[in-house]
Curated annotation (Swiss-Prot):
<keyword id="KW-1184">Jasmonic acid signaling pathway</keyword>
<keyword id="KW-0007">Acetylation</keyword>
<dbReference type="GO" id="GO:0009738">
    <property type="term" value="P:abscisic acid-activated signaling pathway"/>
</dbReference>
<dbReference type="InterPro" id="IPR045180">
    <property type="entry name" value="La_dom_prot"/>
</dbReference>
<feature type="compositionally biased region" description="Polar residues">
    <location>
        <begin position="282"/>
        <end position="305"/>
    </location>
</feature>
<feature type="compositionally biased region" description="Polar residues">
    <location>
        <begin position="206"/>
        <end position="270"/>
    </location>
</feature>
<dbReference type="GO" id="GO:0005737">
    <property type="term" value="C:cytoplasm"/>
</dbReference>
<dbReference type="GO" id="GO:0005886">
    <property type="term" value="C:plasma membrane"/>
</dbReference>
<dbReference type="GO" id="GO:0009737">
    <property type="term" value="P:response to abscisic acid"/>
</dbReference>
<feature type="modified residue" description="Phosphoserine">
    <location>
        <position position="33"/>
    </location>
</feature>
<feature type="domain" description="HTH La-type RNA-binding">
    <location>
        <begin position="363"/>
        <end position="452"/>
    </location>
</feature>
<dbReference type="InterPro" id="IPR036388">
    <property type="entry name" value="WH-like_DNA-bd_sf"/>
</dbReference>
<comment type="function">
    <text>Promotes leaf senescence mediated by abscisic acid (ABA), salicylic acid (SA) and jasmonic acid (MeJA), probably though the induction of expression of senescence-associated genes (SAGs) and defense-related genes.</text>
</comment>
<protein>
    <recommendedName>
        <fullName>La-related protein 1C</fullName>
    </recommendedName>
</protein>
<feature type="modified residue" description="N-acetylalanine">
    <location>
        <position position="2"/>
    </location>
</feature>
<dbReference type="InterPro" id="IPR036390">
    <property type="entry name" value="WH_DNA-bd_sf"/>
</dbReference>
<feature type="compositionally biased region" description="Low complexity">
    <location>
        <begin position="146"/>
        <end position="169"/>
    </location>
</feature>
Amino acid sequence: MASATSNNPASSSMSPRRISGNHGSPTASVAQSPRRPSRQVSSPWTQIVRGESEPIAAAAAVAGPSSPQSRAPIEPIASVSVAAPTAAVLTVEAAAGDEKSEASGGQDNAGKKPVWKRPSNGASEVGPVMGASSWPALSETTKAPSNKSSSDSLKSLGDVPSSSSASSSVPVTQGIANASVPAPKQAGRANPNPTPNHSRQRSFKQRNGASGSANGTVSQPSAQGSFTELPSHNPSPRGQNQKNGFASQNHGGTENPSQRDSYRNQNGNHHQSHGGRRNQEHGNQNWTFQRSFNGREGNAQSQRGTPAFVRHPSPTVQPIPQFMAAQPFPSHIPFPTELAQSSYYPRMPYMTPIPHGPQFFYHYQDPPLHMKLHKQIQYYFSDENLITDIYLRGFMNNEGFVPLRVVAGFKKVAELTDNIQQIVEALQNSPHVEVQGDFIRKRDNWQNWVLRRNPTGSGPQSVDRADAVAKRLGNLSVDQSSADPIGGSSSQLQPTEALSDDQQQSSSTAPVSNHNAPDGANR
């Protein structure tokens, strides 16, 4: 679309901004249009502001026939002054009829059509319209600082190219409410592509007309004569004034360009097609993304989209655990002093140590001594010893008893003890010997070991022998008492060996010689 803009200088010169450069001359702008025949247009709003007295009926007659859709019933609008409301209704109907006629017969693109679709009649009579006599006089302070007058700016509205006619066509409810006239814009902001798009214009016109008739809401003028705008039902983020091509009228009749630019920056991007590029390069970057329509759909509804970058919520910072002081030790539980009563207990009496009494020592006889005595004497009267011990058998009487003094005088018994009473106690329960008084003998078979004596031989020799034995025993007892106080004696009487039968016979025939040792023991 940039090439179309550069190749059509005539169309760019016909933009509303170019018209403001011609000081509002409608004839000059029409003469420059090569596509449509020139036709002078007299705007009804120009007559209203100037105070011309052209009748509204003549304006309605010149407008020509319109389509049946333009004859929709419209509620009359209450005027500011005492003027009849029919004039305003007729003016609105004429404007609506011109718009519908252009929508139906706008297929011929011979030339650009004026806004109000009728030539201006210079010979029209000038008369007061809509109670102009009751309007307050405009002061000099309300004039714009621009060199152009308000009348010149209103004249420039008479001839507008068809590219902006779609934006300047206003529904019934909004066209009357927005009675302001745009101030001349800067030449640098001219639309570089004013190519008309009649199909899009017709669709917007029909849509705006349908919305205006469907709503049925008519704005009421204020008491001061300025028109207020009702809230629009259009969900577009941009204002309805920019969509319809009319800026809101200031109290002074002019518009500040800086305010308009700030309004555009705050309410959305201004639709400017710079060769298919978006307006983001001009510093007007906001979160509302606009689609570029290359100048054909400049009045289309802006489309909202999701932001390019959505900042995620910052991660929550976990608090650093601070130092926790240790809990102090709880104080001790107070104990009431009145309950602390001292208790006294008597001490234990002093125990005097028990004095040691006389010591008693009991003499326990050695058990092995009895066993030793019993074993040794039992051996003397055993069969193995009596066979060879003729000496012991010689002390036996006819009944086989042997005196205890003879047995106690033996060497083995004398080493154990010399106490005859102790020997008797050791032999009380012996199964081999028998003790009767001071004599002892073999318990069984004692007659087998008694020696036979010759009656002829039993003379003084036998008596001497018995005396010698008794003497020896007496000496033994005396020696025991003198040598050993306990009763022991070192000298022991050894029994004679058992003699055989031949020896006994020889001994019976021959006298037995006693060989006494120095200690008196018989060997």
